[in-house]
Amino acid sequence: MQAKGIQLAAAVLLLVGSWANAVEVPADVLFARKIQPLFKVKCLTCHGDDPEKLKGDLDMRTRAGLLKGGESEESALVPGKAMTSPLYLAVTRAHEADWSAMPPKENDKLSAEQIGYIKEWITAGAPWPDAKRVVAILKEADPWGETDGVMVKTSGGLDAGWTNRKYDPQKLWAYQPVSKPAVPAKGHPVDAFVEARLPKGLAVVPQAEAVTLIRRVTYNLTGLPPTPKETFEFVAAWKKDSESAWVALIDRLLASPHYGEQMAQHWLDVVRYADSAGFSNDYPRPHAWRYRDYVVRAFNADKPYDQFVREQIAGDELEPNDPDHLIATGFLRMGPWEHTAMSVAAVTRQQYLDDVVNSVGVTFLANELRCAKCHDHKFDPIPTKDFYRMQAVFGSISFMERKLPWQSFENITGIQADRERYLRQQKTKAIRSITTLPEADRPVQEFDKDSERIGQGKVNNKRRQQLKFQLKRSTPLAFSVANDANDRIHILKGGSIETPQGEVSPGVLSLFSGSEKSASVTSEQSGRRTELAQWITSRENPLTARVIVNRVWQWHFGQAIAGNPNNFGGTGKRPTHPELLDWLAATFMEEGWSLKKLHRRILTSATYQRAVAYPTPETLAKLDPNKTSYAVFTPRRLTAEELRDAMLAISGELNRAQGGIPAHPEINEEVAMQPRHIMGSVGPAYQADPKPAQRNRRTLYAERIRTLADPMLEVFNKPGPDVSCERRETATIAPQAFTLMNSPINHARALAFAARLEREKPGDLNLQIVRAFQLTYQRQPLPAEMKACRDHIAKSLAHHKATKPVKVEPPKYVIRQMVEEMTGLDFWWVEDLDIYSGNEYVPDLKPWDAKPHTRALAELCLVLFNSNEFVYIY
């Protein structure tokens, strides 16, 4: 084991130290290409940009300045001797006893490769060619660049070396015009393109069975299971004419209002939707839900995708009097953001501008534009100037809660009841002393009275501020933006507002036009975003259609054609089927950017309808190790939202009402009661809505609080709303099984399911079991399954007849503890839970209220909910 460890260490050292042998170049070329640009980005902010404020009195603008040294009065540079040069010793960060680590911030430290360049340059005598020689060097071929690559004209980088560099053409695939290649064979175009790239020796599998297909496509398009009636009717139609039955099913599902909800869930993953602002204060966003509902409506109406994009970027400019256009601009504010009395306005404003540019890039162009924030993009032809020119597009906007009356198409149920609840809370004291509790229930018997008085007063004041935010929800406002700012945007050296460089004018990415001028948009306060949106949705823009087509493909197959839907750049995965992607993108634009037509085209292909099993799995694994051939359909697990919604639908509890203010479903009680920092204090405990119909809505409509995740959803890989999610992960971990089997919330679903079976098939256990299988699996139980179910219920019934469940009441209050900052002592208070302690709360069916037979039948229902056949889509 020791020898193995030594070999590993030697390998690491070889990796770090072998950089110098990769490219052998003259030292002056090394300086011009690597050292001088490195100094500009990493060093001159403190040691040269402002000669009057040189940190440590060290001037790194010239060789003479380095030789002179700084406050230590020791030369920072010993030409020919890197190991005695303080400059080299400082950047290695390995000699901090003698020389402070430089750059000082850990996240700014140099890479091993950069440190190696400095070492080689010093060892070679640290030459410093004059400006004329540097210009000449930069016009020559870059020894580290792509020798056979292509140059891309842009608005220009921060240095000539970047501007003139070459790129591997294969990594620029996404920036090439969308073509419409000829379909390689007769039949369905999708199948023709897929089968043209099948590995030699690999055949496609036959079509899946009808029941498998209706389950697959119903979940994919609506996020809900098909009903037994829908399944029966489809199978009957399939037997008569499978092709027409399949097309009719797809059309019915695309016309379902639940289609828009399922597609909106995908979209909200990308745009980072949440009902709170995040960060330490996590301010509520009382009207963000109107954007969520706008997205649902847009998908259901099959709004042309190019129009959908334009409305979200510039809806207020395009149609300032149209409600949906105003609501759509909520997209521009979806990211986490916070500004408090402690914040520096310029910093938080810059954070917003950085975020919104990157969000537009990721969402619509599949480009992480923030990679060009501190320096020219390392892998793509996107100069820093373009990043800040796009910021200038948004420099005219400010946040606005626009007055916008509730619309006839909006669901405003519950808004008035919400308002009345919060008004009641305003009139009562939000918290009370622990002395109001029986002595046995108090956490302590003695405490400092002054700390309690001061601390409770502060907490109470904060509660009232929080209530004011909640009351805003009853006022009809749109979470939007307006053109009433006039920021002057500069390139920020290193991305820092403390080092502004040249001012820039509004513009778009210049790599498509080749110059700054041709990539410019208006400098007028209004209209910038309109021109940006028009550029993004232009048919000449090669990214936009490819990006959304790629996303839709992934929504159906679980993997995208280009494997990184948020990154079409040089570091992203290249398309496995580039001709198919281009053909779909070109056709998508030709057909009016219709997403429903795109879905229909993909879903009617044999590729989508394939079975999941290959006759010789070892052949499939050998010829298609990355599972990109589509010779079979790859099964997927239900998403967290689909899992919860399906259990509610099957148990008969799902409230299918659409839209409206966020719902508050039941979540894990321990998490709900835990203290949560909000608005500079402890936020109120999470309480579920009082009525089952309110809390048992689709998960899409559940309130998304950035600092309070539902554990049930989180454990099944629901992404957080802080970062754009390009692809849902489906990790398999033990807590998933524990949650699905042991969670009291899932037990409640199983109990409600059992009660439904008893209502629909009273007194007949056989019919109840059959109905359970039909609802959960869309099929009849096999004889062996029927016997196993009957045997288990018989044994379980005897147990439940002999055992009476103990009644458990919901908590009526929670005790909180904090340290009073003025005294440094602990204080406590009691927070009353108004919903649980009032008369409004109607619990779900509980074991102590259910008959023994219901509880026994619920055990079977719970097993069905925990089975792979339910949890996975095949």
Could you tell me what each predicted segment is?
Residues 263, 268-270, 274-286, 291, ...:
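Beta-propeller blade termini and top-face loops
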Residues 39, 47, 122-126, 254, ...:
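Protein kinase-like catalytic domain
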Residues 7-18:
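Bacterial N-terminal signal peptides
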Residues 99-103, 116, 124-137, 142, ...:
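Active-site histidine-acidic residue metal-binding/catalytic motifs
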Residues 21-119, 128-191, 195-196, 211, ...:
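Solvent-exposed helix-loop boundary motif
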